[in-house]
Amino acid sequence: MSDLARAFDHGKAFIVFLTCGDPDLETTAAAVRAAAQNGADLIELGIPFSDPTAEGPVIQTANLRALQSGVTTDKIFDLVRELRRGVTIPMVFMTYANVVFSYGTERFLSNCRDVGIDGLILPDVPYEEKEEFLPACRRYGVDFVSLIAPTSENRIAMIAREAEGFLYIVSSLGVTGERSEIKTDLASIVSLVRENTDIPCAIGFGISTPEQAKKMADLSDGAIVGSAIVKLLAQYGKDAPEHIGAYVKEMKDALR
């Protein structure tokens, strides 16, 4: 079993997304620790990019704040190395192909292994292009996490059959961000995924309330929340980790 799959060993998983370096790396570290201590099962660390096409305005702005704070990929690797002295839950990077290419794919994934990153999510890399990254991911023991958006049954089945770690099911087409309601027929997507793989699946994009998180986790194996947490960072800055801890506890309690 991959380390990522272990995040789903203790019931429904609550997965937290944070943009590294927003507002600074010290706050990111404190926020990750607060999330882990309050029940987060897996952390997605966003490596900021100047053109984050999958993101809505909340996370786009977080990317800009992080880049303006002087964050670099090397500094983020140092951050993870430091976090791994105490944080034991799985962690994945979520970023864009250009970030990996410009750093050097082999070097990037070798460093992922060395610092303790368990998986990689690249939302701008479609299924057909994942071979550009998959061999290096496998060489260094880093799961390449696939996203499934509302699409044809054949495509969902094809992606599910080759999935690694866990599957990230996108609740609705479009960019990340909170939504008042989610109308996609997610039950059918999850059912199709489960017919084709034993790998756990979690739903993200648009989840912000305990009620939404419970509904999504009841359908799948977990819920992923990003924009609502990034909003806390925008609102409270360096004081956000305390608020993030309380929010994570409330959300995780809703999944128990």
PLM ranges: what are they?
Residues 76, 191-202, 208-256:
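Alpha/beta catalytic cores of nucleotide-metabolism and tRNA/nucleoside-modifying enzymes
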Residues 19-24, 94-102, 126-127, 147-151, ...:
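Glycine-rich beta-to-alpha transition loops that act as phosphate-gripper elements at the mouths
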Residues 25-35, 151-161, 203, 207-223:
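Catalytic cores of alpha/beta
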Residues 14-18, 43-45, 91-95, 120-122, ...:
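Hydrophobic faces of well-ordered beta-strands that scaffold small-molecule active sites
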Residues 47, 60-122, 255:
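Active-site beta->alpha loop and helix N-cap motifs at the rims of alpha/beta catalytic domains
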Residues 41-51, 117-121, 126-129, 171-177, ...:
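Glycine-rich phosphate-binding active-site loops on the catalytic face of alpha/beta enzymes
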Residues 1-18, 81-85, 256:
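N-terminal amphipathic alpha-helix/helix-capping segment at the start of soluble metabolic enzymes
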